[in-house]
Amino acid sequence: MPVAVMADNAFSFRKLLDQCENQELEAPGGIATPPVYGQLLALYLLQNDMNNARYLWKRIPPAIKSANSELGGIWSVGQRIWQRDFPGIYTTINAHQWSETVQPIMEALRDATRRRAFALVSQAYTSIIADDFAAFVGLPVEEAVKGVLEQGWQADSTTRMVLPRKPAPGALDVSLNRFIPLSEPAPVPPIPNEQQLARLTDYVAFLEN
């Protein structure tokens, strides 16, 4: 039986991850059901545990992968994460109709990615084009700019530049809660120019090394 989706919070997702791992270990012949594989793969992505995600993807039997397209959809999100393609993460998540056991996890992953993008931009940039910033955080330009203005950032309507404010230690997670929408976000803006994207990608790589 597939594991039921639990309440949408970090503790519940951690508990669900443990349950899925146990179900895989206890599965006959070591082969779990597709719903368990789907939840487990999505949860590894939510935890940003790319090593376990890759190992899981490799050990899922090819027949199960080919018969369950959702698994490939989840892994395509993982590939965008691996490539540090922030706009691509939002686009890929929004492009799929997820099952009800996976959808809450993917929504949480989208929100966690948005938080991370806000944090990285605030640390890596002194200024950024508003359209590029909106693409990084997966929000419409107007909503993204309005939100950061309320957090003390600056924006120049003439140059269409956003000027991030360096966050106080520990303050960013709380202040970014307002950017987690209750409904589906509008279509993601165009992918930012290559120089902006390369700069953020390089900065993410620097932080992770």
From Swiss-Prot:
It comes from the Eukaryota. One of its GO terms (biological process) is COP9 signalosome assembly. The modification Phosphoserine is found at S175. One of its GO terms (cellular component) is COP9 signalosome. Disulfide bonds: none annotated. Pfam families: CSN8_PSD8_EIF3K. It is found in: Cytoplasm; Nucleus. The keyword Phosphoprotein applies. InterPro entries: COP9_CSN8, CSN8_PSD8_EIF3K, PCI_dom. Component of the COP9 signalosome complex (CSN), a complex involved in various cellular and developmental processes. The CSN complex is an essential regulator of the ubiquitin (Ubl) conjugation pathway by mediating the deneddylation of the cullin subunits of SCF-type E3 ligase complexes, leading to decrease the Ubl ligase activity of SCF-type complexes such as SCF, CSA or DDB2. The complex is also involved in phosphorylation of p53/TP53, c-jun/JUN, IkappaBalpha/NFKBIA, ITPK1 and IRF8/ICSBP, possibly via its association with CK2 and PKD kinases. Component of the CSN complex, composed of COPS1/GPS1, COPS2, COPS3, COPS4, COPS5, COPS6, COPS7 (COPS7A or COPS7B), COPS8 and COPS9. In the complex, it probably interacts directly with COPS3, COPS4 and COPS7 (COPS7A or COPS7B). Belongs to the CSN8 family. This is COP9 signalosome complex subunit 8. It comes from Rattus norvegicus.
